[in-house]
Amino acid sequence: MKVNDRVTVKTDGGPRRPGVVLAVEEFNEGTMYLVSLEDYPLGIWFFNESGHPDGIFVEKME
């Protein structure tokens, strides 16, 4: 995924939420995405852990 991609994010206790990627940071363990959400327009960071399906919080919108 890259900046400006439309995505959904997994959050605790609710359905996936739509957002837009504002920034991407790569790490050995996975990727951090700064995602703008309706109630966090300036963005909130989510981490996708490499190699662990349960650690995937950001997915590209179809």
Swiss-Prot record:
It holds the Pfam family DSRB. It comes from Escherichia fergusonii (strain ATCC 35469 / DSM 13698 / CCUG 18766 / IAM 14443 / JCM 21226 / LMG 7866 / NBRC 102419 / NCTC 12128 / CDC 0568-73). This is Protein DsrB. HAMAP family: DsrB. Coiled coil: none annotated. Belongs to the DsrB family.
